[in-house]
């Protein structure tokens, strides 16, 4: 989930680019549902033996009626049934679409590791201030076995869900259906449906599912009651969703495009993200990482309609560190060379992501709502509406500081929340997030992974065979 950079982001009517809206298609045909696991069938065979005389024939006839047949040695054996038997699904097997909770598959809670990368030699004698030293010690203390188990479980949920999603994210599918598949899969695999009070805080979705088309760079999700949006052949779709287990958030994103004309755009962004992951590490300077990302990203160009267009790194979004139950920490990793003295530190968790665009390389707020986030330290003194107080209680008990969407509220059965939400927003208790767009006609791609900076290695926890 992309984080806004302090500079370069353009808001409101004075933005450099004209207003645009997310393209929508109404009443499209629904795609066929994905098939489940194929069940094998075992067929039985019948074997009959005849005797030499009438007595034997009569005996065999009686045996046939009783369901017993003789062997060659004269001993009787039971006749095989013609009934077809279903092959049982073995334990530890996932379904298609994925709906079996991971604790039911990984009984010992030994989830797959991410990609383990050893650190290059570094200077362990670097001096840090006392405050930094205390922060390091706290972070390392928290990076225990439970921490790794939670993170690896969340990462495996992400891998299994996105593997299925990649198979159905084809032209003709509705964005609402794609979001439903992602969210249903995450809830099923974590084993937490998020309906009972507090259940969504134990494990589940870490923020609203992002499904951003073309010039929409980030923060767009289908909302209940809105016009349906259908994926088309010439679309560039960014799929960004997060999974958490006990507040340990895995944030990972990828881009799909059916038209091969955009292959170079996707290649550029994937290469830039992998460069950021390669350079990330303990004591790594963030300005150096940003410069390396930009150099790789902007070495590519895309040919569209016979015109070569350079790929530009977005200047208004950044990667970010992740805290427990908070998708955005205080550190940012821009995609362009920047002046900062910040370094990555031991115990940090980072979402290393990059966005590349064929447009201007800047984003602005678009009309619409992506999601909501609680300002945990905001005063509630001016809150008078009963509906707002009730909604605030629901938000605190079920989402805390996790970002959520209208769809998540309605999944819990919350109704008539619009007036209360407006009151919470006007009192600065809840922040509203809008879609972020580049200029109309441009195309933006995104790739993202979560990396843990462990004491002796970095673990790209969300890495899979796909990206």
UniProtKB/Swiss-Prot annotation:
Localization, UniProt: Cytoplasm
Name this protein carries in UniProt: Methionine aminopeptidase 2-1
Family statement drawn from the similarity comment of this UniProt entry: Belongs to the peptidase M24A family. Methionine aminopeptidase eukaryotic type 2 subfamily.
GO cellular component terms attached to this protein's record: cytoplasm
Location of region: Disordered: 1-105
Domain of life, source organism: Eukaryota
E.C. no: 3.4.11.18
One function term, GO molecular function aspect: metal ion binding
Record's compositionally biased regions (Basic residues): 75-90
Catalytic activity: Release of N-terminal amino acids, preferentially methionine, from peptides and arylamides
TM helices/strands, residue ranges: none
CDD domains: MetAP2
Binding site for a divalent metal cation 1: 240, 251, 448
Binding positions (substrate): 219, 328
Classification via Pfam families: Peptidase_M24
Named cofactor requirement(s): Co(2+); Zn(2+); Mn(2+); Fe(2+)
Co-factor binding details: Binds 2 divalent metal cations per subunit. Has a high-affinity and a low affinity metal-binding site. The true nature of the physiological cofactor is under debate. The enzyme is active with cobalt, zinc, manganese or divalent iron ions. Most likely, methionine aminopeptidases function as mononuclear Fe(2+)-metalloproteases under physiological conditions, and the catalytically relevant metal-binding site has been assigned to the histidine-containing high-affinity site.
Swiss-Prot/TrEMBL GO biological process terms: proteolysis
Acidic residues bias (residue ranges): 43-55
Location (main, coarse): cytoplasm
Function of the protein: Cotranslationally removes the N-terminal methionine from nascent proteins. The N-terminal methionine is often cleaved when the second residue in the primary sequence is small and uncharged (Met-Ala-, Cys, Gly, Pro, Ser, Thr, or Val).
Basic and acidic residues bias locations: 1-10
């Amino acid at each position: 989930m992309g984080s806004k950079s302090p500079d370069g982001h353009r808001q409101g009517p004075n933005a450099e680019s004209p207003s645009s809206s997310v393209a929508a298609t109404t009443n499209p045909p629904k795609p066929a549902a994905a098939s489940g696991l194929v069940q094998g069938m075992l067929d039985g065979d019948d074997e009959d033996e005849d005797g030499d005389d009438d007595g034997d024939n009569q005996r065999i006839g009686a045996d046939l009626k009783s369901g017993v047949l003789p062997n060659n040695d004269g001993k009787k054996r039971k006749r095989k049934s013609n009934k077809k038997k279903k092959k049982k699904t073995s334990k530890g097997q996932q379904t298609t679409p994925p709906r079996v909770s991971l604790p039911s598959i990984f009984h010992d809670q030994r989830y797959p590791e991410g990609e383990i990368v050893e650190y290059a030699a570094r200077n362990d004698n670097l001096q840090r201030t006392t405050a930094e030293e205390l922060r390091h010690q706290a972070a390392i203390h928290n990076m225990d076995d439970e921490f790794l188990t939670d993170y690896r479980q969340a990462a495996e949920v992400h891998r299994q869900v996105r593997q299925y999603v990649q198979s159905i994210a084809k032209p003709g599918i509705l964005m609402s259906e794609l979001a439903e598949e992602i969210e249903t899969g995450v809830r099923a695999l974590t084993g937490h449906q998020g309906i009972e009070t507090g259940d969504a805080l134990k494990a589940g979705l870490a923020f609203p599912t992002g499904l951003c088309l073309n010039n929409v760079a980030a923060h767009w999700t289908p909302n209940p009651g809105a016009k349906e949006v259908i994926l088309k052949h010439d679309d560039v779709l960014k799929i960004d969703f997060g999974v958490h287990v006990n507040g340990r958030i895995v944030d990972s994103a990828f881009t799909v495009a059916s038209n091969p004309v955009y292959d170079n755009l996707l290649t550029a962004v994937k290469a830039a993200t992998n460069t950021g992951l390669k350079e990330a590490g303990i004591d790594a300077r963030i300005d150096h990482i940003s410069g390396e990302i930009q150099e790789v990203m902007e070495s590519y160009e895309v040919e569209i309609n016979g015109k070569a267009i350079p790929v530009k790194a977005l200047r208004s979004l950044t990667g970010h560190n992740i805290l427990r139950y908070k998708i955005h920490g205080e550190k940012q990793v821009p995609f362009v060379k920047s002046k900062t003295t910040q370094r990555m530190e031991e115990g940090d968790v980072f979402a290393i992501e990059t966005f590349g665009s064929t447009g201007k390389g800047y984003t602005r707020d678009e009309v619409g709502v992506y999601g909501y986030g609680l300002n945990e330290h905001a005063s509630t003194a001016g809150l008078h509406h009963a509906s707002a107080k009730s909604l605030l209680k629901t938000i605190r008990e079920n989402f805390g500081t996790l970002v959520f969407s209208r769809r998540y509220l309605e999944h819990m059965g919350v109704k008539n929340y619009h007036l209360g939400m407006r009151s919470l927003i006007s009192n600065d208790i809840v922040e509203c997030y809008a879609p972020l767009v580049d200029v109309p006609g441009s195309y933006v791609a995104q790739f993202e992974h979560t990396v843990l900076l462990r004491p002796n290695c970095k673990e790209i926890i969300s890495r899979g065979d796909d990206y």
